[in-house]
Regions:
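Residues on the lipid-exposed face of transmembrane beta-strands in outer-membrane beta-barrel proteins
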Residues: 1, 39-45, 84-88, 133-139, ...
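Surface-exposed extracellular loop regions of Gram-negative outer-membrane beta-barrel proteins
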Residues: 1-22, 29, 32-83, 94-95, 151-153, ...
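Outer-membrane beta-barrel channels and translocator barrels
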Residues: 1-3, 44-48, 89-93, 130, ...
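Transmembrane beta-strands of outer-membrane beta-barrel proteins
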Residues: 4-8, 37, 50-52, 95-97, ...
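C-terminal beta-signal and adjacent terminal beta-strands/loops
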Residues: 103-105, 147, 155-157, 213-216, ...
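Gram-negative outer-membrane beta-barrel transporters
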Residues: 13, 101-103, 123-220
Length: 301
């Protein structure tokens, strides 16, 4: 069975701004008109569903982007998203695969820096892309045991990027051109595996393992500015204490970061020149070690 769809969206966004703290004289009155079409095909053949789609998406910059780009006003970003894949289902297992190519024009990417309140700053890059494959496997060994495994492999690149370094010797900025570099804070490999044990209708126990590959703190693909890869294990249990027609009580217990791994999933970097020497400062947001969480959820219907 072959089916198709077409989705047409038109958006109008108006920006009005009467300056802000660092640039009180910046007066903005801009209107963005976006046409976002999407179309796709799918074909159902017994246990397999094939699909393909293409979509255009436009997105306006946000207030933080204006504050980060005092000299040059940020542009809207445009995306053409191509996707294709399949879903294969059987009573005891299922396999999904999805290929994608996201072609950006003027993508607003993280710069690796933060503003005066600690929020990440973004800038437009003329040409960039994100491409990859997503795979997911679900398998039920029996009524009590099941597992889900997913993996994402991607390449996230900026075709051309200019890095600006503050030079305190000359009171100016040094521009460094980079070609075909990785987009900041974009891991190339991420995996997730969940093992579920359900001994009865009241109790479910989940063991989740997540892996994130190394990431770059900024868009220079500099090996001295990275976030290390990490592997996490979490265990959580859900126990349904009471399940009535109008009243449900659920007890949940979580053990996060079971192996007490020291890791930082986010951070920022800043480089400057002083006394003819370049200094780079990498800063990290470390997460908690092993931690516990107990909750009681009550639903009234």
């Amino acid at each position: 069975q072959l089916s198709s769809y077409v989705d047409l969206q038109y958006r109008t966004v108006n920006h009005q701004m009467n300056g802000f703290t660092k640039n009180a004289g910046l007066m903005i009155d801009r209107t963005f008109n976006f046409f976002n079409p999407k179309m796709g095909l799918s074909y159902q053949a017994k246990s397999i569903l094939y699909f393909a789609s293409v979509a255009v998406a436009n997105k306006e910059p946000i207030r933080d982007d204006f504050e980060a780009s005092v000299i040059e006003q940020p542009k809207r970003e445009q995306l053409i998203d191509w996707e294709a894949g399949f879903e294969f289902k059987k009573p005891t297992y299922a396999l999904n695969a999805n290929l994608y190519f996201m072609d950006y024009k003027d993508q607003l990417v993280l710069t690796g820096k933060i503003n005066d309140v600690g929020a990440y700053t973004r800038t437009n890059v003329p040409k960039s892309y994100r491409a990859g494959i997503e795979l997911q496997l679900k398998y039920a060994f029996n009524k009590k045991y099941s597992t889900t495994y997913s993996v994402s492999l991607s390449q996230n690149k900026i075709k051309s990027f200019t890095e600006f370094i503050d030079d305190y010797d000359q009171y100016t900025q040094v521009a460094i051109q980079h070609k075909n570099t990785s987009i900041a804070l974009s891991p190339t490999i991420s995996t997730n595996r969940t093992f579920n044990w359900k001994p009865n209708d009241k109790l479910s126990v989940f063991w989740t393992t997540k892996y994130i590959s190394k990431q770059y703190l900024d868009n220079t693909q500099n090996e001295s500015r990275i976030l290390d890869s990490y592997l996490l294990n979490d265990i959580n249990a859900h126990w349904t204490i009471l399940n009535k027609a109008k009243f449900k009580m659920l007890l949940q217990f979580y053990v996060n970061n079971l192996l007490d791994v020291r890791y930082a999933p986010n951070g920022y970097t800043y480089s400057y020149i002083y006394d003819r020497a370049t200094t780079t400062s990498n800063n990290y947001y470390p997460m908690a070690g092993r931690n516990y969480w107990l909750s009681l959820k009550i639903d009234l219907k």
